[in-house]
From Swiss-Prot:
One of its GO terms (cellular component) is cytosol. Gene3D superfamilies: Nucleic acid-binding proteins (2.40.50.140). This is Translation initiation factor IF-1. It comes from Thermotoga petrophila (strain ATCC BAA-488 / DSM 13995 / JCM 10881 / RKU-1). Residues 1-72 form the S1-like domain. PROSITE patterns: S1_IF1_TYPE. The keyword Cell inner membrane does not apply. Pfam families: eIF-1a (PF01176).
Length: 74
C-alpha cells in the first residue's frame, strides 16, 4: 500500500474490538474496520470510543483501514 494508493478520511470511533481493532464511522456515514498504525502503538497512544481519528483506506478494499492520527478533543 504505497502513499499514492491510500485515501485519508476522518471519522469517529464507535466500537473497540479485540487485538487493537476498532469500528470507525466515517464522516460520509460508512463504517469501516480499522487497526492502529505501528507508530501509534509504539508511542502508546490510547484510543477510546468517541475519539475523532484520521483513517487511511486502501483503494483496493474500502471496508478496512489503518488509524494514523487521533485528533485533539476540542
Amino acid at each position: 500500500m504505497g502513499k499514492e494508493d491510500v485515501i485519508r478520511m476522518e471519522g469517529t470511533i464507535i466500537e473497540a474490538l479485540p487485538n487493537a481493532m476498532f469500528r470507525v464511522e466515517l464522516d460520509n456515514g460508512h463504517k469501516v474496520l480499522a487497526h492502529v498504525s505501528g507508530r501509534m502503538r509504539k508511542n502508546f497512544i490510547r484510543l477510546v470510543p468517541g475519539d475523532r481519528v484520521i483513517v487511511e483506506l486502501s483503494v483496493y478494499d474500502l471496508t478496512r483501514g489503518r488509524i494514523v492520527y487521533r485528533k485533539k478533543p476540542e
